[in-house]
Amino acid sequence: MDANGIKLTPKDIVSKLDEYIVGQDDAKRKVAIALRNRYRRSLLDEETKQEIAPKNILMIGPTGVGKTEIARRMAKVVGAPFIKVEATKFTEVGYVGRDVESMVRDLVDVAVRLVKDQKKGLVKDEAVNKANEKLVKLLVPSMKKKASNNSNPLESLLGGAIPNFGNNDDEEEETPTEEIKTKRSEIKKQLLDGKLEEEKVRIKVEQDPGALGMLGTNQNQQMQDMMNQLMPKRKVEREVPVKTARKILADDFADELIDQETANQEALELAEQMGIIFIDEIDKVATNNANSGQDVSRQGVQRDILPILEGSMIQTKYGTVNTEHMLFIGAGAFHVSKPSDLIPELQGRFPIRVELESLTVDDFYRILTEPKLSLIKQYEALLQTEEVTVNFTKEAITRLAEMAYQVNQDTDNIGARRLHTILEKMLEDLSFEAPSMPNAVVDITPQYVDDKLKSISTNKDLSAFIL
């Protein structure tokens, strides 16, 4: 968790969101207040802190207007664990498919990665040093003592090829001779000077365990987690370049240097206190007809989500986590249904409502120009790698914005995602030919845009399929 990020004022948070997201000021203000309230809560005494629950947010707006991006960027600002799920992927408890508790387990997995990555960063130098020492031994090996022949009691059960418990890559080696010591010293100097990066070495790496395919998705995952914890890790030999081996070995050594149990406990606390779960397409499980079978199933999913929003103890492979103080953000277009079609108990769990506006021509223009790494800057950077300089005129950008808006009006409104499609189609020929035109300078003008796109954008049938 970013200690500086959580102390940001609402104005600071909105300012950071403005670097990446255009418009939607009301939504930005509300998520900024929700984040600041978490910081305020952390300053209170324990008794008061337990009474204050986060105010969950319901975002209402068509696709492509920034609902997911606002939540994702908000989580990055404070370094909070964030997970996006789709309400339509869940099934009622007892049916085959993902149950709603899986989103909490996924959030904890994200929190564990965040905490461990942070802790690995603190021991990175030591881990790299250990990796370099190991590489020197691999590049200049000495005689190794005979390994123990004790068999693994699980070997016959799992078809062999399981290493003994307690064994690792570093087999005990005999005391190196003076000649080997001298050679290792020379190799170490070359290694640190970066002269051996492409040399091949053989290292042992953990092999991903095979998936269990005979159960439903959720039961499968739980069984897989349990088996992974019980069984020792399979290791296989791979031949890789030194630079790749260093990364793999340094990561393994970093894992050994950090206290795994402490990291897991910190991750559970981080998920509980700072976790953000974004539930997309929540409008698809809303229903205004409780009589049909499909609608009954949707209500079942809503009722399964409800106790998690209220606060439940969920069992994960790292321990039990309490969802009471997690922040939940529901989102949906609500074209067919409306928020009042959600069951009343669930409506009450999303006290903050924010309606996001459809994008205008001006919004599209700003999306193309204002963000820190706008789409146009991305394409310019990509083509610059081929030594092709692309210059977009203001008039061309305006034309692209108008075209994106018009295609959205004439076909399905997919918001800002339409710009990706239009830019990709417009620059398709240039991207293909770029390697054969070094040092070229291409000016993107309104005429260029029209030449590439006008015949398609003005034909509703073509634009529906191509743009």
From Swiss-Prot:
GO terms for cellular component: HslUV protease complex. It is found in: Cytoplasm. ATP binds at V22, G64, V65, G66, K67, T68, E69, D280, E345, R417. SMART domains: AAA, ClpB_D2-small. GO terms for molecular function: ATP binding; ATP hydrolysis activity; peptidase activity; proteasome-activating activity. The keyword Hydrolase does not apply. The keyword Transferase does not apply. GO terms for biological process: protein unfolding; proteolysis involved in protein catabolic process. Residues 146-185 are annotated as: Disordered. InterPro entries: AAA+_ATPase, ATP-dep_Clp_protease_ClpX, ATPase_AAA_core, Clp_ATPase_C, HslU, P-loop_NTPase. Keywords: ATP-binding, Chaperone, Cytoplasm, Nucleotide-binding, Stress response. Residues 168-177 have a biased composition (Acidic residues). ATPase subunit of a proteasome-like degradation complex; this subunit has chaperone activity. The binding of ATP and its subsequent hydrolysis by HslU are essential for unfolding of protein substrates subsequently hydrolyzed by HslV. HslU recognizes the N-terminal part of its protein substrates and unfolds these before they are guided to HslV for hydrolysis. Belongs to the ClpX chaperone family. HslU subfamily. A double ring-shaped homohexamer of HslV is capped on each side by a ring-shaped HslU homohexamer. The assembly of the HslU/HslV complex is dependent on binding of ATP. This is ATP-dependent protease ATPase subunit HslU. It comes from Staphylococcus haemolyticus (strain JCSC1435). The gene is hslU.
